[in-house]
Amino acid sequence: MGGRAGAGRDRLAVWEQEKHGERIAEGDWLVSDAERAAAGQETIAERSRALLPGNRDRAARQYADGGLPDGHELTRVWLPRDAASLEARRGRQQLAAWAENGVLHVLWRGEAARAILMGGVQLPLWPVDGAPGLWEASVRVRRLDESVISLMVAAIAEGDTVFGQAAAGPLVFRGSRAPAEVPDRPLDGALDVYLLESPVLRAPRGVTVYVPPGAGGGGRLPGCVLADGQSVTAFAPRLEAAILAGTAPPTVLVGVHNAMPRDPASRPKADLRSLEYLPQYRSRRFGAHLSFVADEVIPWAGGRLPVSPGPWIAAGFSNGAAWAIAAGQRRPDVFGGVAALSAGMVPSRVARASQRVRHYLAAGTLEPGIRRATAEWAARLERTGMACAHREWPGGHDDWWWRSQLPAALAWLIPGQARGT
């Protein structure tokens, strides 16, 4: 949660936005509350505490109403509850979740100045009165019985930035009619990590590669570049299960690591991931990164891996999905397909040179802005006569759904190569 201070806005400023019926305090995610306090500015923590009574009143009225506002798939609700009964419901779990009458309840115990619920639902957790260290969130969700929602908690210390520290999760809530989980099993395919020296980036960059089983027989397989390539280790098991079941084509997954350090304490004073993934920032880093992928990584993969010369698939989730769309628009000589899952920022127009690029676009019902942007981009592509599949899932900005959707995306983008097609 949070964002960058736009042009003309004080980087120390705190602003508000409404999300799911709640007024939320936000600020530039690279600025800490300690920096704001040192400058005599209001902090995000102070504004959040000031907003809490009004937010509770609105959420209590919404709980009593029993429904959802028109056009909304999710809304915050609240009912005053006894701390002891909540603790009993939490039991020994640090993070707990359950459903009652279409309402998802979440409890977390931990120390923080502020706590943020992340994953498929992204909202501040509220402190429970009379129970220091106990935090709660309740949301009414349309189609909750069909939903899969990953839940995590980011704990933000006094004076910290909006990043915070991962404190709990992931806990996966699964509705009574939700898709079944794919059982964990050891990979039969190969998973390897490489470090590539890049002349265009002027620095080394990690690449994680998944090669499906049976790929060593001399044949060549389609290739898919995945943004945020550290996540290939999480995507590979679901993809391999689909390949073995015949519902996805055997595909080599090449994951190009993003530029951001994993440790929040070592993050630079710039969002390097966004600068590389989003052309809207007009940074030279975007062009350099795209050239690195198209002109260095893909030729490297062609010489080392059992992958066909092309065209390749560009895939990603969140800002990585925006990158995949931009890659298809700007380098149709390399990418013949795009798998964009939860892309929040899309181009303003369709590049004429990209008319033959196939697009698989998908978003969750619980990420309204991204859902709307995805639908608008799909409609724009369809108006130009381009091949486009548009899907939605009953969930949010959630890696469970991203991992589930990639095999379906590859099956659609590479028609006729899955055994079940």
Language-model features, listed with the residues they occupy:
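Compositionally biased, low-complexity flexible segments
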Residues: M1-R11
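Charged/polar low-complexity intrinsically disordered segments
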Residues: R9, Q17-E18
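N-terminal amphipathic/hydrophobic targeting modules at extreme N-termini
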Residues: L12-V14, I24
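Intrinsic low-complexity/disordered segments
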Residues: V14-Q17, A38
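Non-catalytic cap/lid and distal C-terminal segments of serine-dependent acyl enzymes
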Residues: G27-Q122, G130-T421
